[in-house]
Amino acid sequence: MAKHLFTSESVSEGHPDKIADQISDAVLDAILAQDPKARVACETYVKTGMVLVGGEITTSAWVDIEELTRSTIREIGYIHSDMGFDANSCAVLSAIGKQSPDINQGVDRTDPLEQGAGDQGMMFGYATNETDVLMPAPITYAHRLVARQSQVRKNGTLPWLRPDAKSQVTFAYDNGKVVGIDAVVLSTQHAEDIALPQLKEAVMEEIIKPVLPAEWLSAQTKYFINPTGRFVIGGPMGDCGLTGRKIIVDTYGGMARHGGGAFSGKDPSKVDRSAAYAARYVAKNIVAAGLAERCEIQVSYAIGVAEPTSITIETFGTEKIPADNLTALVREFFDLRPHGLITMLDLLQPIYRETAAYGHFGREHFPWEKTDKAELLLRDAAGLK
């Protein structure tokens, strides 16, 4: 693999699937703020004029599902029927039950350290040294483009932008290293009265140029800005949205493997979410320690069992110490039992709504992005405890 291209995409907070993710995580946060031991599995469906919030929730907390839903949509920016969706007038339906007692008996334990996994499954974490946040460049810059779209929409720089948008960035690699950007796609919903030439110029000057490093752009870089020519109908009016349908956008943009489990709306007892965060934490600390240039961790669980059924490390030939030694370090310094990783990363906090747009990884303020174990790993790897 000497020279190759790699592409990742992202979507804005106003994309229908991301509206659903944010509502699910807003419900989760509101419950965790009152009841950190709650069990939450909240799913959301959005379509023109309606929102359905469902799932299984067991908690002592009370939250106003309807108001949470409306306020979330309002913050995203759907506040008028002209946009095809209005937080103030859409119907909000609720269909929420309790978590199955069969699951409860496998998860809950008298000794918290023996807390079982909430389900079986495998989760992956990944890190690479190709960006400052130790994330793949394609997904990092795809996220930054749509985040910038939101910023200039909300601060009035480009007031004719609307909430729904998508980005896609194709990077060129040579021998595993980024050498440039081959193509950029940015599609953004807009008001009906904006002309396409004006939109293209504004998007280039206010969104693309401020985000993408100039040294990676060239005369050969291709730009596709609203390539269909018109994007007035968007959001839930254009497509229905569902929680958990953007799992590649949420993670590594396809650069790493994915276990298949979505994140949003799930409390940390669900290892689909918490173990994926812990796996990112492990991989990032290995790369931050300089023990590998790229690192992918797989961890797997059996429902009701505390200890992971497997921990596997792949470093793609970039490791500085033998893989067996890396695995031993991970087992020594990271507690990947459900209760252990929840405690290690302080996951029983209402911090999840923010994760539901622009990526769960590569954003330094989240606890799973800390590199506080890197020095310990490096010291131990060198035999200097």
Curated annotation (Swiss-Prot):
Gene Ontology biological process terms in this record: one-carbon metabolic process; S-adenosylmethionine biosynthetic process
The UniProt record lists the keyword rRNA-binding: no
InterPro entries for the chain: ADOMET_SYNTHASE_CS, S-AdoMet_synt_C, S-AdoMet_synt_central, S-AdoMet_synt_N, S-AdoMet_synthetase, S-AdoMet_synthetase_sfam
Pathway info: Amino-acid biosynthesis; S-adenosyl-L-methionine biosynthesis; S-adenosyl-L-methionine from L-methionine: step 1/1
GO MF annotation list: ATP binding; magnesium ion binding; methionine adenosyltransferase activity
Cofactors named for this entry: Mg(2+); K(+)
Stretch list, region Flexible loop: 99-109
Binding positions for ATP per the UniProt entry: 15, 164-166, 230-231, 239, 245-246, 262, 266
Cofactor binding mode and count: Binds 2 divalent ions per subunit.
Record keywords, A-Z: ATP-binding, Cytoplasm, Magnesium, Metal-binding, Nucleotide-binding, One-carbon metabolism, Potassium, Transferase
Stated role: Catalyzes the formation of S-adenosylmethionine (AdoMet) from methionine and ATP. The overall synthetic reaction is composed of two sequential steps, AdoMet formation and the subsequent tripolyphosphate hydrolysis which occurs prior to release of AdoMet from the enzyme.
HAMAP family (alphabetical): S_AdoMet_synth1
Subunit structure: Homotetramer; dimer of dimers.
Name the record gives this protein: S-adenosylmethionine synthase
Annotated organism of origin: Sodalis glossinidius (strain morsitans)
The gene coding this protein: metK
